[in-house]
Amino acid sequence: MRLFDKIVDKMVSEKVPRKRRRRLIIYIAVITLLSMTTATVAWFSVNTFAGVQNLDLHISMSAQLKVAMEDYGTDLEKYGKVITNEMIDEYLQKQNTRLADIVLDPVTTRAGDVFTNQRGAERVPNKRSYLEFECYFIATEEMWVHLTTESTKQGEDDGTKVTTTSTGAKADVVNCARVGFTTAENGTAIYEPNRGTPVNGQATFDLPGGAMVYTDNTRIFHIEQLKPTKVTIRLWIDGEDPQCDDDVQDAQLGVQLGFIGCDENNVPIS
């Protein structure tokens, strides 16, 4: 209302006739109301955000592919097959936060490395915007790393999937989530679960709903033999996605990522 007061004061000082002044004020009020009601199409209009419930990474036991939160060079004993919430929390401690405190305020991106909000302002990670952390993959032979929906070991259900415990319309949060994987060699690959029409010029991929089939589209990065490869992983809610509306506010998101190594013909390495 301060804006209207300033306008009125200015019109009074400039001796604008009272009748014309009333018309101008009503016109300005209508325009402002329209801008408020049409500003939000897909983006949240109220910032109560979505939260990250869990985020786990699992690697197939068959191929000699391992991962760690730090670069341990070629000391394979210090790498493992799993990255847990607790390990991600240790990384986030450097930024005075933890996974349980991460909230996903809608952002969008074209290439998966620079993120902006609805007003076009650039956002930084892990600050009520999007989640970002780094990890290092290493393999005993050259390979392409793929996402997989298959369980990484027998008897487990740890393949790639994005889930929610939220119900009703909030469950649509799984449709507007994105996960990006960035390396110096291969750039960024963006996984879009339940992929729809691409938004904001993004090049994304989805995984098959049935039996897993490995193709060039499921590749996320390449690894040289015994060369630690830094991978930046980002999780965000894309505000340009049609499902990213007020219905999914306060939803909880769970992300499980399964990785497998394949040869140049996309055949899993045993």
State what each model feature region is.
Residues 3, 9-98, 249-253, 261-270:
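Short, polar/proline-rich extracytoplasmic segments that appear immediately after membrane translocation
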Residues 16-18, 42, 157, 174, ...:
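Short, structured coil/loop segments at alpha-helix boundaries
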Residues 41-43, 51, 68-72, 93, ...:
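A composition-driven signal for long, intrinsically disordered, charge-rich low-complexity tracts
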Residues 49, 62-64, 74, 88, ...:
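Generic "edge-of-domain/loop-turn" microfeature
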Residues 57, 67, 135, 179-181, ...:
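Generic structural hydrophobic/aromatic packing signal, biased to beta-strands
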Residues 111-158, 201-270:
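C-terminal, structured domain-capping segment
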